[in-house]
Amino acid sequence: MKIIVDMMGGDNAPLAVLEGAAAAVKEYGVSLIGVGNEELVRKTAAEHNIPLDGIELVNCTETIEMCDEPARAIRSKKDSSIVVGLNLLKEGRGDAFVSAGSTGALHVGASLIVRTLKGVKRPALATMVPAKKQAYLLLDCGANVECRPEMLAAFAVMGSCYVNRVEGRTSPSVALANNGAEESKGTPVLREAHQLLKTTPGIRFVGNIEPRDVPNGEVDVVVCDGFTGNVILKLTEGVAKMLLGMLKEMFLRNLGGKVAYLLLKSGVSDLKHQMDSEEYGGAPFLGAKQPVIKAHGSSKAKGIK
């Protein structure tokens, strides 16, 4: 397998990307194509003693910044790491493209360069989110801020297929994120989407799900627009960090708490491990003709690997 990697994407690029890429080559035996400013990449690798074995470098002179307007950037920055990387994927030079760069640019690029599967209007960004019973697939989690009912139905089909094939779950349950369980709740788009999902073949739609019930992990797939999904995802991350911090502070207040913390430390560590976004690597754009993976913008080496 050969994976194309955006060396310039993310808050910690190119160092974290280089470290993660080198670790992936060593541990998984994959071949990589690193796309980015070759001079900077080689300089960073030399300064930090990072081997470039198994990494073919493709030079680029431009970078799409987080503040750039996605569609304009994809069209104007032809020599950016994202555009070049996606074109390499389209040409068959690699099996997948991974980037921690701009979500919007990746979304537009996946649509315009890689293209979408027949019947899919826009790719959906999907990620597995840890929950009480079991992790669930959340889509869209940040690519399509506004969605029509038929788009949400397409997301449900793609999400159901993904969970079945990748997670091995038979007849996965699909729920629509809404502000109430009743069919009459929500915006006109959500009400129409609910009716459409009830008659969509190939999925097991179980109705609406309220935000308070999402973390229980009772359903396999949660469908929503990208704005709602991104709020759910980031709120989950924030609450997890807050609770872990509060637990630690509570345990360390007195001697009894410290003793209890020592006894429960392995369990707390396991929980922290489950809630760590670095453990989940990247999120695929479902519906693109070829695999395009979005890594967290703040990814460190572990997340990239």
Residue ranges and their predicted role:
Residues 5-14, 143-153, 294-303:
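Short, glycine-rich nucleotide/cofactor-binding loops
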Residues 15-16, 31-33, 39-42, 145-207, ...:
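Glycine-rich phosphate/diphosphate-binding loop of Rossmann-like nucleotide-binding domains
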Residues 1-42:
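N-terminal phosphate-binding or glycine-rich loops at protein starts, especially the Walker A/P-loop
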Residues 50-94:
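Phosphate/nucleotide-donor binding subsite
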Residues 111-138, 218-222, 226-305:
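Glycine-rich phosphate/nucleotide-binding loop
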Residues 5, 94-105, 109:
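A short, small-residue-rich loop immediately preceding and capping a beta-strand
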Residues 6, 25-26, 49-51, 74-78, ...:
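Solvent-exposed alpha-helices and their adjacent loops that cap or buttress functional pockets
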